[in-house]
Amino acid sequence: MDELSETQVMQNETATAVLPLLNGESQSFNLQKHLKYLTKMLDPLPSPFTVLDASRAWMVYWELSSLAILGKLDSSVCERAISSVRQLKGPSGGFCGGNGQDEHLLSTYASILSICLCDSTDAYSLIERDRLYDWLFSLKNPDGSFRVNNEGESDARSVYAAVCVSSLVGISMDDPLFEGTLQWLCKCQTYEGGLSGVPYAEAHGGYTFCALAAIALLGGLDNLNEIKLSTWLVQRQDPALYGFSGRSNKLVDGCYSWWVGASHVIVASGYGSASHKSLPNLFYNPEKLLGYILQCCQSTSGGLRDKPPKRPDQYHTCYCLLGLSSIAYDYRYHTSDGWSYKPSILHSSLSSLLPAHPIYCVPFGFEERIKSYFLSQESSKF
């Protein structure tokens, strides 16, 4: 008998942990336990969390996003968040990962989404748009991509971050800032159909979302092979465990319910294509995905996780909740009216969740209010 590969061993171990839960007593969405977990994460964190010092901006966003998608984000939490994000402001217009650190494009993305969620003039005023614009230009590469900082890497995450935050603060997608960016992103589509972090690398669920969302904002979805992309996205749902994986021959992970799930929504909605033609339904089984998240990703003490037997964390709580929102509603995009959504057939199981914008990763409405604010502000740059 042939020896099993490491991949096969890990898949068997995952199935052994997942299947008893998947086939066990039916679980409902446990709102109160998740709120208890999120409330606890607002307390001072113990010393092991010091390893996440450079992820402060992200921890603020994950907390705010989770509370917001549950409709439980209040002004007192926003005031604390504004104070925290203010300490992360850098000298050039970007935001840092932690206090006193260098500005970083991904930390800037997380900080601006947090500002968006705080939904107030006090929060919006933390963004110095003209300085941010100059800083983004300083990170631009000749090939159209963006570095995360002056000496950092360039990939689909950093490009999406640049495009996304620019869109939120009123920088046009036709601005010279994005010359060559769409072309660079489209080179990231692989022979499998998904998109990679950089051209000619392996397709990945997280990078696919980042590249696809940026391409959609730039209006270039027609440049992709959508049939191959859709096929690859369908293949991300495990046929036995029903969760999504991030790559071929990789394990299911609750966070991909958003990275892959939102990618399905973008493609099906028609947003970012010339025709804006929407499809009648998604290409995967949302009911089975719901089962995986509710049965296997909910911790008994609250919060959500990658997969059993792992512990819950802020990252997976945030993106599992966003993933659940993506199946709680049917999303469409209309040229004249913009985005619309209505409860899906699964909504009754997830009625405490608000609809999430598949591009901006915040509940609908927040993105429009920050855009309106910056459209009313004068700029010397554009």
UniProtKB/Swiss-Prot annotation:
Binding site for Zn(2+): D253, C255, H316
Pfam family, one: Prenyltrans
Cofactor note: Binds 1 zinc ion per subunit.
Keywords: Metal-binding, Prenyltransferase, Repeat, Transferase, Zinc
Site (Important for selectivity against geranylgeranyl diphosphate): W58
PANTHER family reported for this sequence: GERANYLGERANYL TRANSFERASE TYPE BETA SUBUNIT (PTHR11774), PROTEIN FARNESYLTRANSFERASE SUBUNIT BETA (PTHR11774:SF6)
Organism of derivation: Schizosaccharomyces pombe (strain 972 / ATCC 24843) (Fission yeast)
Annotated family: Belongs to the protein prenyltransferase subunit beta family.
Keyword Metal-binding: yes
Name recorded for this polypeptide: Protein farnesyltransferase subunit beta
GO molecular function: protein farnesyltransferase activity; zinc ion binding
General function of this protein: Catalyzes the transfer of a farnesyl moiety from farnesyl diphosphate to a cysteine at the fourth position from the C-terminus of several proteins. The beta(cpp1) subunit is responsible for peptide-binding.
GO cellular component: cytosol; nucleus; protein farnesyltransferase complex
Chain residues that bind (2E,6E)-farnesyl diphosphate: H204, G205, G206, Y207, R247, S248, N249, K250, Y256, S257, W258, W259
GO annotation terms (biological process): protein localization to plasma membrane
Cofactor(s) needed by this chain: Zn(2+)
Top-level class of the enzyme under EC nomenclature: transferase
Subunit organization: Heterodimer of an alpha(cwp1) and a beta(cpp1) subunit.
PFTB repeat start-end pairs: 78-119, 129-170, 178-219, 226-268, 286-328
